[in-house]
């Protein structure tokens, strides 16, 4: 078994239309070792552009995004990212925590699904799991 190669740093992009949540994530990430926040986006279009330029290891993604800028939501973005970047880790962080959203996101390839209100504290643990994950040697 070999560790995933994150070049010693996990590179993260956040996608959320709430400035408060984005700031909470930034604050949390700033306290973690080996995490580099590459940038944040509020809608799917700007997120795709940022992600294509930066190629993060991890995307922290909300379902509801800025509807004024795009007709794509976080699930649409999840599908697009999963098809283009199958190795990228995607953490869904949303207030839409009903089972049907969780099932859809997991079915479309999300690695984690967290409720913003109840599970925010789980983000560091998920990032740590990603950093220390092992995969079979090829």
Q: What residue ranges belong to the model's regions?
A:
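Two-component/phosphorelay signaling modules centered on CheY-like receiver
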Residues: 19-39
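Acidic, metal-coordinating helix/loop segments flanking the phosphotransfer/catalytic sites
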Residues: 40-58
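Non-catalytic signal-transmission and effector/linker regions of two-component phosphorelay proteins
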Residues: 1-11, 19-21, 121-138
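Negatively charged, flexible loop motifs adjacent to catalytic sites
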Residues: 20, 43, 96-100
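Short amphipathic alpha-helix used as the core "switch/output" element in two-component signaling
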Residues: 70-86
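Alpha4 helix (beta4-alpha4-beta5 surface) of REC/receiver domains from two-component response regulators
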Residues: 72, 76, 97-114, 118
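The short loop immediately C-terminal to the conserved phospho-acceptor aspartate in CheY-like receiver
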Residues: 64-69
